[in-house]
Curated annotation (Swiss-Prot):
Protein name: Lon protease homolog 2, peroxisomal
Domain Lon N-terminal: 11-256
Annotated spans, Disordered: 72-101
Role played: ATP-dependent serine protease that mediates the selective degradation of misfolded and unassembled polypeptides in the peroxisomal matrix. Necessary for type 2 peroxisome targeting signal (PTS2)-containing protein processing and facilitates peroxisome matrix protein import.
Amino acid sequence: MAEAVELPSRLGILAFRNKVLLPGAIIRIRCTSPSSVKLVEQELWQREEKGLIGIVPVRDASESASVAPVLYPGGGTDSGERNVKSQPGLSDSRKADGKSQQEAVHWHTRGVAARALHLSRGVEKPSGRVTYTVVLEGLCRFRVMELNSRGNYYTARISPLDITKADMEQAQQDPDFVSLARQFKVTAVELISVLEQKQKTGGRTKVLLETVPVHKLADIFVASFEISFEEQLCMLDSIDLKVRLSKATELVDRHLQSIRVAEKITQKVEGQLSKSQREFLLRQQMRAIKEELGDNDDDEDDVAVLERKMQSAGMPANIWKHAQRELRRLKKMQPQQPGYSSSRVYLELLADLPWQNATEEQKLDLRAAKERLDSDHYGLVKVKQRIIEYLAVRKLKPDARGPILCFVGPPGVGKTSLAASISAALGRKFIRISLGGVKDEADIRGHRRTYIGSMPGRLIDGIKRVGVSNPVMLLDEIDKTGSDVRGDPASALLEVLDPEQNKTFNDHYLNVPYDLSKVIFVATANKVQPIPPPLLDRMEVIELPGYTPEEKARIAMQYLIPRVMDQHGLSSEFLQISEDMVKLIIQRYTREAGVRNLERNLSALARAAAVKVAEQDNATAVSKDFHQFTSPVEESRLAEGAEVEMEVIPMGVDNREISNALQVMSPLIVDETMLENVLGPPRYDDRETAERVSNPGVSVGLVWTAFGGEVQFVEASVMAGKGELRLTGQLGDVIKESAQIALTWVRARAMELNLVATGEINLMEGRDIHIHFPAGAVPKDGPSAGVTLVTALVSLLSQKRMRADTAMTGEMTLRGLVLPVGGVKDKVLAAHRYGIKRVILPERNLKDLVEVPSAVLSNLEIIYAKRMEVLEQAFEGGCPWRQRARL
């Protein structure tokens, strides 16, 4: 508890609107306005523990000034400070920023001196505004004699009103004071006893009763619970000890009585709850008895409710007739009969389906839709342009049967979120139907009701859950459906996605037609090949390419890092990740088309930071019991747009505990050392390609997968044998044939390539060749490895190394022609991702490079191949063939 403090003649003044700080009370405030920040810097921050400020209550100008005297502005002083002399009944009035209206600040003439127990400084991001968090302890009362404006804040000449030791000794001789003190302590002990029973606290408060003078106890107790502003002012103005004790006893007793009344109400409510629980158990027993007797009135009531619900569902006439027939059948059945439950569940489904309920479409704002797409997704310019075109057609002709969009691309490039953005732009509800791993046609069409455990298909169930007949429905992973003896889900989707047929979609469980023509379908897939051609014909494929490293870095800074920080309860005050570190993560730890692995790595860093923050004993969440105050004078220097957040500290809290609890932790900055500690050693190395092609017989190819483009190494080795070719690496038939073609072409041109001496005929005589595709657990197939295979064989047999900065793709024929291949865009992006500088492509794939970002092409040298003479570009020092040889 604070000892007597000698106050200076002048204090810096901080105004509290409709709130009073009493001596002995401890509060936490947050200062954000320029005036309060300046006050804290000048009076507290620079003076450290010696700093004192005055807390003076103020009230709104609209409130009556009769309760508290007010101050008004006077003339200037020699020191340049504006003088404001104290006179009752007047106010501080001034023109704000040259405006004609005037603001009146009603200052109370008494305040409380306070000292800072703890002071911390912070900077808000991104504004850079400086804020202070201060823990203040009220010391003693004072009277405001003169108020002055010093720069951005106020100071006041004060007169202390503290009780002296002589005054206290004299009061203790007064029988009335002794009686009041005894009565106050008795009431306080009763309050502590009640609180101790409710909250298991009060030990430290009892110590206060024995050690703190009674006149200070009065202020401390009153400050510990909520009272009105007028009562707070009354306590502040109670200079006379007997008046103060009398008022404090009254307030403490009133608080005690309110707690006791609340306890009585709580006990009464708990008694009523016990009675309700008893009635509930009896009713449950009564219901069980009625079920045994076959006389259950509750079920009859439920059936009546179901009937009313069906009547209000808005079913078409033919379906309503079917539902009535089923309802009559249900009414004739007893609840114990086997078909009762299934029939009732079926009717509940009919009643819950949105037959007429539909979302009213908002007026399409293409500009807002474009802004939404740009804010949710980075890049994807052509994809977003196609979506805007789709929305423009919907705006001009809402009932148009537009194409069904199918977003195809690697995982993590934003396919699902694009569908959600379309839903938001149209103002419709969004429902996602996952088709991954679906092999049963009944998952789409539903099970027939004759089977036990039958249920509707995923589409009807989704319509029921979303509650409207015109949602945006996402058919996610449509390429992952399979087929077995139970049917082909893709065949069932033919009816769903055909605008001519889905008007009368027939779910096997529902057994009545349902109109799906109002639903906007959007599909996603990783690759097109598994989708059956008839189903693919009903959709418009929009390909989403993988992201470049530069795009990933921008996505991480704009989207991923803020989301990860929010998910882990962090902010930039705890963790900072620079763009350079993000690029390092992309380069060393993720080589993917999308950004999911990048987000996982960022989450790992956030978790590591969360552990360090949580391990700090004093890193506690902000209290929910904060009270927010706004300055009454918006235009004055007192608090221009000021906002002060206050938290009352409980009685008896040790000041050292408060200081320790508010220590500020410096942010954790991610560097290379932290990356290795959290994410482990780098998974990828820019030198990998150079190291793997350092020996002859290795070439670098480019392949396409469902997860985007990848670099594929091809290794060849020769040994003594019988002229056989061995292939390993889990290869398909097409790629095996490409290897045979490559070997045949090399054998036919062995002399031109200087692979055999003049006169030799058989290149393979007495030796075998083994070709291996690393990553043997991954299936590989396709014709695009032809050029890569030839390069590996020529490198092996000529003992010349391939260039480490070059990768290639292309199908080849027996005559040496290089044919175009697919997936060129993803392959080029993969080469750029792996740090490759030169790419050999079929000449007829030139048109496909239009879709590759210019930032990627500017960093690559593209070499076009029409025939196999491009081999010269693949080797260091050129190809070893003879002059004038035509390949």
